[in-house]
Structure formats: structure tokens, C-alpha cells
């Protein structure tokens, strides 16, 4: 029996995770779902944002479904020592799972083009997957320092680090439209020269059926807004991926529509990208679409059930058209939207 660990977390996390878990139970009744604490909620209960009992539960998990972590800006959690803050629990979780590749789909669903800040003709049909390296680069290198009026950080990658995340991108492209755009700054950065060399060599050895091109990060930052439909899979390192994925996140028009997956050698981590929204927590009005679409990614990448994942995505798209949530200009609350997704699963256009 497959095991999925749910970590509802803080703010609206428990509400959207409950909605997502309800959908998961409906479409995969054989899955054992086990709930554990993380973030501020875990600190309040156990004095640790990533308690040992949560860590232990991951050992035999097939996938992890995360809600949201953190509180308001004036939350007393922000006055805690940094290792005890909710966000430290999230970082510890990612380290424990060894997640080295983040997958961020950017899709404009049919009938929802009006939500995008782009013109409808630019937004229509956008379907991008950004694959970002998560554990290396300038964010994690230990060679860093502030000394008087001088500071430095080091961007460093090795061939094995580049190849393992590139394999994820090429594999994803094989399931999609067969095109990968590798993003770097090889005209000025030696680390990008290595990145470009290793990505190209891997493609030439193992993925000759995938079309690969290389583009500079500044060019992609412009073109992903001016002509987003030109991209299929975007592969990039940690810093560039952090910026590009947040830039692309505005294209669908709401963070409430954005799921994500983080993959590594262990169970994958699946989560909506939106924050904990403490201002609306407990009111039952949070949009659970991103959490439910994270379940679709979990089914596809964590449990290898792509057909069921496709059904969930189609059901969410139908529910969004017929029962939009309040953040999208509609009236549906969390419960109403979740039921709409479950009802849509029985629609001929979904099944």
C-alpha cells in the first residue's frame, strides 16, 4: 500500500491540504495517508519546526504533500532563534528528502486567459515546465563571507550535480513536447560554461530525441513574458531558476493556481507555491486549486499514475470555469470548490 505523508503546516495550509487529501482519497483509495506536523504548528506542539516524529515518518513514505509554512510578519514565531522558526522546518524537510530538482508548471488553463496580466493572445495555451536545481549554486556554497566593506558568495557546480537535474528535465520533455531550453550566462560565467557543456554532452549521449537549445538568462527573462508559448521545458540552476520561476508565476494570474514538485533520491515533496495567508486562515475561503493540482503532480511523479493525474487536472480546470473561487472573482469557498472538483471527476469530458 503506497504511503503519503501530509504536512498541513500553518495558516491556510490545513484547509487546502484537507481539500487535496480528500481528492487523493477519492482517486487513489488504496493510498495510506498519514498526517504529521511541520512549521509553526509543529513548534507550538513539540518545540521544533521539524520534529523527530515527522522526520521518522518520511522513512517509508512514497510521497509528501505539504501545505504552507509560516505566519504573519508580526508573528511571534519571527522573534524565535532562526533554527526554531517555521521556515527552518521547511528547509530541514527539503534537506532530509534530498530534493535536488524543483518542477514548477506554468499553465494558463482554457477559459482563464482573462486572469493573466498578459494579453489573452499571449497567455492562451501557455504550458511551461521550469526545472530548477535546488541544492547547489550560490545559495548553498560554504565559501561566503562579509568582512568589513567587502562581501562575497561563490557559485559552484559539479558535473554530477548538473547531470542529475538535467536528466529530470530531459525525462520531463520526453513526456511533453520534446523541447528543453537550458538557461545560463555562459558568456560571462565560467560556472555557466560548465553547465552548458555538461547539459549538451548529456543530451548528445542519452537523449538524442529531445531538442535542446541554450539561452542566456537575461534573454529568457524578456521572452518568457513577451512570447511565453515558445517554451516547453526550461532547465536552469538555483539562482536563475528562483528568479525565473517567480517571474513566470504571474502568467496564470493567481498564485492559487500554481503547484510544484521537488524531486530527489527519496520521496518527492509536492506543495502549492502560495503562502500561508494568515489573514484568511480558518475562514474556509482559501483557494485549494494549487494544493489539488499538487496532488496531480504527486500522482504523476510520486506514484507513477499519469492517467489519474490527468483526470485530476481536467477536473480542476472544469471546476475553475464553473465554480471560480473568490480570489478569481467568483463565489466558491474552499468546500464548494473541492466538491466541484470531485463532481467533475465523473464528467465525460474529464474521465
From Swiss-Prot:
One of its GO terms (biological process) is L-leucine biosynthetic process. Pfam families: Iso_dh. It catalyses: (2R,3S)-3-isopropylmalate + NAD(+) = 4-methyl-2-oxopentanoate + CO2 + NADH. Substrate binds at residues 94, 104, 132, 218. Pathway: Amino-acid biosynthesis; L-leucine biosynthesis; L-leucine from 3-methyl-2-oxobutanoate: step 3/4. NAD(+) binds at residues 71-87, 275-287. One of its GO terms (cellular component) is cytosol. The record marks 139, 185 as: Important for catalysis. Binds 1 Mg(2+) or Mn(2+) ion per subunit. Its EC number is 1.1.1.85. One of its GO terms (molecular function) is magnesium ion binding. It is found in: Cytoplasm. Keywords: Amino-acid biosynthesis, Branched-chain amino acid biosynthesis, Cytoplasm, Leucine biosynthesis, Magnesium, Manganese, Metal-binding, NAD, Oxidoreductase. It is an enzyme of class 1 (oxidoreductase). The keyword Cell cycle does not apply. Mg(2+) binds at residues 218, 242, 246. Its cofactor is Mg(2+); Mn(2+). Catalyzes the oxidation of 3-carboxy-2-hydroxy-4-methylpentanoate (3-isopropylmalate) to 3-carboxy-4-methyl-2-oxopentanoate. The product decarboxylates to 4-methyl-2 oxopentanoate. Belongs to the isocitrate and isopropylmalate dehydrogenases family. LeuB type 1 subfamily. PANTHER family: 3-ISOPROPYLMALATE DEHYDROGENASE. Homodimer. This is 3-isopropylmalate dehydrogenase. It comes from Deinococcus geothermalis (strain DSM 11300 / CIP 105573 / AG-3a). The lineage of its organism: Bacteria, Thermotogati, Deinococcota, Deinococci, Deinococcales.
